[in-house]
């Protein structure tokens, strides 16, 4: 009966190894459990399950071929997964690496190179094949995601968050400075406090904000709102986008404002409001579609050959106020 029970049990549990005593599973910690060839559980309450699995700290859990959990209360789950920080979690298998041309990365012997899932700092979490969380409190979720800043979060395949408390969400998104946020595929926030939202959006100045498909805010405190909008000057604001084949708004001088598709403000402290409006000179204002302000300290509501009237103008009362036609007619009548 004992032989029959033993035979039945082995039908549902098998572990292959050398079977010569050289790769026995070893559990040396109190209440530790080791299962699999060369599995090792050393800490109190440690659990190592899988060939070559190592659980080397109190309450550590390693599950999978060559999985390693060396931090207290750490969890490594997956082939080659590594959880080395206290309270760290690494869940995922290995991921084959490819170069920028899509060719497999090979070692010196011509063998493919694989990246393991790794959580190497206290309270770090790595989820996904080849994901890496390498600083305290960092979270990397997605195949190849990498969170290397303290308390940073990288969510998405190959997303990267390298600044302290940086956040990157989306395929190959990147947040590379402290407090930076990038949300959207290929989005990038590369300076302190920068925020990029949208596919391919880029925020590269301190406190810059880019919102929209391909929007770019590339200088200090600049703001670009709309698809492909560009704000490239300090404190600049570009509002209004354009899709492929059309002209986006662009605020390129310091402290300018460009609003509407194709609005352009290269002048310092200039404002362009309207489709294709241009404020070229410093402190100039262009109002209306195709308006051009090309002299300093002026306001333009049209352009040469495309002039506009200004209507509903109240009578001027101060020396620098505009004078309307009624006032001029009154002067003409009085002089007769």
Feature map (PLM): residue ranges:
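Glycine- and small/polar-enriched repetitive beta-structure motifs of secreted/surface proteins
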Residues: 1-320, 326-333
